[in-house]
Amino acid sequence: MWRLKIAEGGNDPYLFSTNNFVGRQTWEYDPEAGSEEERAQVEEARRNFYNNRFEVKPCGDLLWRFQVLRENNFKQTIGGVKIEDEEEITYEKTTTTLRRGTHHLATLQTSDGHWPAQIAGPLFFMPPLVFCVYITGHLDSVFPPEHRKEILRYIYCHQNEDGGWGLHIEGHSTMFCTALNYICMRILGEGPDGGEDNACVRARNWIRQHGGVTHIPSWGKTWLSILGVFDWLGSNPMPPEFWILPSFLPMHPAKMWCYCRLVYMPMSYLYGKRFVGPITPLILQLREELHTEPYEKINWTKTRHLCAKEDIYYPHPLIQDLIWDSLYIFTEPLLTRWPFNKLVRKRALEVTMKHIHYEDENSRYLTIGCVEKVLCMLACWVEDPNGDAFKKHIARVPDYLWISEDGMTMQSFGSQEWDAGFAVQALLATNLIEEIKPALAKGHDFIKKSQVTENPSGDFKSMHRHISKGSWTFSDQDHGWQVSDCTAEGLKCCLLLSLLPPEIVGEKMEPERLFDSVNLLLSLQSKKGGLAAWEPAGAQEWLELLNPTEFFADIVVEHEYVECTGSAIQALVLFKKLYPGHRKKEIENFIFNAVRFLEDTQTEDGSWYGNWGVCFTYGSWFALGGLAAAGKTYTNCAAIRKGVKFLLTTQREDGGWGESYLSSPKKIYVPLEGNRSNVVHTAWALMGLIHAGQSERDPTPLHRAAKLLINSQLEQGDWPQQEITGVFMKNCMLHYPMYRDIYPLWALAEYRRRVPLP
């Protein structure tokens, strides 16, 4: 059986940590573990998921839950309640629901104080990792038979009915993910006619019916060129000389969004080297299977701008294609020939590799995320197959792997700090302090130990990095990358917990460390008043015209985000109340400008676009929370009135809310089909209305929402897993299984606290 290990580094000499691996979560397979009953429980969960995979596509993250509930001997001893038609909700029944949810949520916590969970959903995360270890000769050591079995299970579970795979688990089939997952199956041992439910044949038919892999998007062209299934001549240029451009140019790396910068950094190294892995018999077979004409006859120059229509979310503007054509026709032939290959290209590759090593070392070889991780790992191997850098990368691969009832996938990276911050706030909101003292103390300890206490090493500005001291990351301290909303939520948790006796929740965080967090937040506000997520926004918006991806939008430069802004307002308002003398004027100006940003970014229908959750419901919750914290009310703020109107008009007949993931790419509100409600959306909307003072005007919509949440609670005290609720870059969804535990509980806690009940 599979077991999740917490905060363990083992004795691997290539592993190192800044805080003794607090927050680390790694799965291990133990063939001797588990009773017959436990194994049967896991198999039943797997079977149920597969049989219902087209109805509910996100997993329930059950393997970890089975383990932790069993280890903690959890049994729900508090009886459930239901609210009948025409029945009035009482304080007592709400409290019973809260107690059941609180006990369950507290039991899901680990020994180091965080709440482990999957954070995945995109179907292009795992295949490149498989490609990388295949190319480098480490496939068998990184993915032994049980790993391969679970990776294949995940691929089969998320294959669409038409034979393809979507960009994410709920998406329509795309060439990018269908080709990647097909190759992944073949590398893991499936024959051309193999796979569950004829998976390989169905996938290959989909690929060939849509023009073959010459129509794969640019990221796919890169990976297939690395494998040798494609030719680098069929890719648009990614010159490493980009890394030696003078800083005054608008296209300098320092002006790029960090994720874009750190994806194209190792890509440009591999492109500059024109690296191709070993041409094995399997690679030769794949050339035959995936192209619609003989490999030797393909006109690679004509494939550069080909892309299947199913993959296109952001069509390249003409100016971009002209730039790529110019680089392809004029620049690359020069840079790859003497003397420029020695004078310029060699220097560019050295500088690029210097940046790769810097980013690796400052993230303890986790890197900023899974796409970058695999590319940087491969670049290190290309530079030195026996070097320590590659070995350190291999040691951190387990940090990215996650097992659920739908199989093994690769995480975007962990959401440990993100989930912990909201879980702690939800528990605090219940006011059931006496019943959850250990959970609060452990959560507090985890949050304190996870704060980043240093800036990136050395002259970090010359490496295009921003300050990180005082921040919280999305995952753990080792990751090292500051995020504004994670910092705001971490700061808020520490401030709220400081109001409780230390004998219950532990010693409060030192003021200097809180001041560091405030400094980080203040540094990330833009001239527009909004908050960027990772680094200050301010680069020219027209640079988005150069977005080289086909399936993401707004990835070239950093932007301001509603959620980050709303979180920061709430944290700084609370900080100002508890530390009124610290940078008072700066904080007041920050809040004033942040409120202006929220008012300016409200849409015509009264909602706010959510960048990291689905979608207008999510954004509206953060915006209304920020406005209310800043002292705005329904009476004195038109934005709040419009926001309330939006939420009330989108409430369903059953009292809930349900928003389709399609809202995010389409940028208009799209309800779930069939008038379905989603408990997470319902919780966000309920809290948004409570922030806006709805209970003082007409509490009926709040009662209807609370009724749905109370009646949706499951036997153990959690809530059902429904549609996916996370998103990034407008067009790709992320699955957060902990959301179904945290947000309904938090919303009902706020409901009980703010709405008069009999």
Swiss-Prot record:
**Molecular function GO terms recorded:** beta-amyrin synthase activity
A UniProt-annotated Pfam family: SQHop_cyclase_C
Identify the EC number(s).
5.4.99.39
What keywords would UniProt list here?
Isomerase, Repeat
Q: What is the enzyme's main class?
A: isomerase
Query: Which CDD domains does the record associate with it?
Result: SQCY_1 (cd02892)
PANTHER family cross-referenced by the UniProt entry: BETA-AMYRIN SYNTHASE-RELATED, TERPENE CYCLASE/MUTASE FAMILY MEMBER
Record-stated family: Belongs to the terpene cyclase/mutase family.
**Function noted in UniProt:** Oxidosqualene cyclase converting oxidosqualene into beta-amyrin, generating five rings and eight asymmetric centers in a single transformation.
Which protein, by its recorded name, is this? Beta-amyrin synthase
Per the UniProt record, the source organism is Pisum sativum (Garden pea)
Q: What is the lineage of its organism?
A: Eukaryota, Viridiplantae, Streptophyta, Embryophyta, Tracheophyta
